[in-house]
């Protein structure tokens, strides 16, 4: 989740500076809470986390009085890209979630890794054993939409790679959006 937050907020800040309408606080809150529903998947639901956590995320956030965050956070599946009119915050969250993967090291600790869009796509195909031709087509379609979104961001000077050293040439952060240490 922290890796997804890092990528999403990194891009949201630049997007806003580039004139793309995005609510950084909403993007941040949704990215931090997008997988909170995994904690609601217990008992017989535990094996269905990949399918049910969206609902439990929405239920928890809605129940705590933050419906706007709930709508973005709960709709972060790549399959949500099949709908055409998604807010920028949703696109940023879906894009970030697609690129960030948690993998276990030799000692069993989870390590967050940020992949390029292409490498993330390859990683998904490598890991999914039940990849039917229909799923392959859906993932290709999702990848194409995410690639188009990435190209759109790049065309506006948004650097999607948070590990790059140096600032994006198209943006200088607004002081009001920076933490005190920055």
Task: Please describe what each predicted stretch is.
Residues 2-19, 33, 43, 78-182:
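Divalent metal-dependent phosphate-bond-processing catalytic cores, especially two-metal-ion Mg2+/Mn2+ enzymes
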Residues 4-5, 22-62, 71-80:
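His-Asp-centered metal-binding catalytic motifs of divalent-metal-dependent phosphohydrolases/nucleases
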